[in-house]
């Protein structure tokens, strides 16, 4: 094998933008909605997008999606172990 081919998952048209929230952003999000991380939807650490970001269990991922009716909306997931 000549070399490892790298594929950037975030360049695919069907994959929305993902990013890891900072500790300050995480705290603000949880306070704003008066929730705990356990109340957020989960995303596994083995998810290709999570791996590409280098996120670890406990991190909160912000996902930015485009919608024809709502414009842009954000949703959040907490990274959990497999």
UniProtKB/Swiss-Prot annotation:
Protein name: DNA-directed RNA polymerase subunit Rpo5
Annotated GO MF terms: DNA binding; DNA-directed RNA polymerase activity
Encoding gene (name): rpo5
Short name of one Pfam family: RNA_pol_Rpb5_C
Superkingdom of the organism of origin: Archaea
The protein's role, per its UniProt record: DNA-dependent RNA polymerase (RNAP) catalyzes the transcription of DNA into RNA using the four ribonucleoside triphosphates as substrates.
EC id: 2.7.7.6
The entry's keywords: Cytoplasm, DNA-directed RNA polymerase, Nucleotidyltransferase, Transcription, Transferase
Catalytic activity: RNA(n) + a ribonucleoside 5'-triphosphate = RNA(n+1) + diphosphate
Organism whose genome encodes this protein: Pyrococcus abyssi (strain GE5 / Orsay)
GO BP terms: transcription by RNA polymerase II; transcription elongation by RNA polymerase I; tRNA transcription by RNA polymerase III
PROSITE patterns: RNA_POL_H_23KD (PS01110)
Assembly with partners or alone: Part of the RNA polymerase complex.
GO cellular component, one term: cytoplasm
Similarity comment: Belongs to the archaeal Rpo5/eukaryotic RPB5 RNA polymerase subunit family.
Enzyme class: transferase
PANTHER family per record: DNA-DIRECTED RNA POLYMERASES I, II, AND III SUBUNIT RPABC1
Subcellular location: Cytoplasm
